[in-house]
Amino acid sequence: MTASPRYWIGTSWKMNKTLAEARGFAEALRDADALRDPAIQRFIIPPFTAVREVKSILSDTSVKVGAQNMHWADQGAWTGEVSPLMLRDCNLDIVELGHSERREHFGETNETVGLKTEAAVRHGLIPLICIGETLSDRESGRAAEILSEQVVGALSKLSGSQKQAQILLAYEPVWAIGEKGIPAEPSYADARQAEIIAVAEKVLGRRIPCLYGGSVNPDNCEELISCPHIDGLFIGRSAWNVEGYLDILAKCAAKLRGDTK
């Protein structure tokens, strides 16, 4: 029996790429499938307009494909929203929830992230729950408190067997993401992720993977993936072209093959 991948490394394209551009990326990734490493689970999160096409192109690979958001309701008068049923209809695997841009610009709260997490699990989607403190949170010494509130809020609506579902966390300090983001020092990220994992374990009764995201690039990916509490990387613009993504995958795979962690 083949062991499940230990690490998750993927990218969300945010509001980028036309259908043709998305298709080109997916085809290039498919054509490079022989380079995959069994220790790494790859995933891609395109915009809604491209998810079905990307999933179709990658259907014969191990790459998981996801959506960047969803509503918690199955259907109804929610103009402009997309339901978990619709994502399942596109054969998607993952749904990204609670990104800081959703929280800041679209009124996402710990409560709504919790509702969406429960709906995702109920419909067999893997929730990738984004959490992270702002610079002011960090400077005021409230980072651990804020992160704990976000983790508990996201997971507290799960009950019974739902707590055994596949769930991913992604620690993305708000000050580290975006074009002007400052990458977190690996030691800082690892310490925060240890705290996040401990909080989630108290809620769920088991350890779940926690990825790091925030200005991940080819220069820092190897040091980050070597940290004991970093279970993968959630990459932004450094992986928006397929060459960049494949480069980071290759560097991490090589590092892990020689790693004893």
From Swiss-Prot:
<keyword id="KW-0413">Isomerase</keyword>
<dbReference type="InterPro" id="IPR013785">
    <property type="entry name" value="Aldolase_TIM"/>
</dbReference>
<feature type="active site" description="Proton acceptor">
    <location>
        <position position="172"/>
    </location>
</feature>
<feature type="active site" description="Electrophile">
    <location>
        <position position="99"/>
    </location>
</feature>
<dbReference type="GO" id="GO:0004807">
    <property type="term" value="F:triose-phosphate isomerase activity"/>
</dbReference>
<dbReference type="Pfam" id="PF00121">
    <property type="entry name" value="TIM"/>
</dbReference>
<comment type="pathway">
    <text>Carbohydrate metabolism.</text>
</comment>
<keyword id="KW-0119">Carbohydrate metabolism</keyword>
<protein>
    <recommendedName>
        <fullName>L-erythrulose-1-phosphate isomerase</fullName>
        <ecNumber>5.3.1.33</ecNumber>
    </recommendedName>
</protein>
<dbReference type="GO" id="GO:0019563">
    <property type="term" value="P:glycerol catabolic process"/>
</dbReference>
<dbReference type="InterPro" id="IPR035990">
    <property type="entry name" value="TIM_sf"/>
</dbReference>
<dbReference type="GO" id="GO:0006096">
    <property type="term" value="P:glycolytic process"/>
</dbReference>
<comment type="function">
    <text>Involved in catabolism of D-apiose. Catalyzes the isomerization of L-erythrulose 1-phosphate to D-erythrulose 4-phosphate.</text>
</comment>
<comment type="similarity">
    <text>Belongs to the triosephosphate isomerase family.</text>
</comment>
<dbReference type="InterPro" id="IPR000652">
    <property type="entry name" value="Triosephosphate_isomerase"/>
</dbReference>
<dbReference type="GO" id="GO:0005829">
    <property type="term" value="C:cytosol"/>
</dbReference>
<dbReference type="GO" id="GO:0046166">
    <property type="term" value="P:glyceraldehyde-3-phosphate biosynthetic process"/>
</dbReference>
<dbReference type="GO" id="GO:0006094">
    <property type="term" value="P:gluconeogenesis"/>
</dbReference>
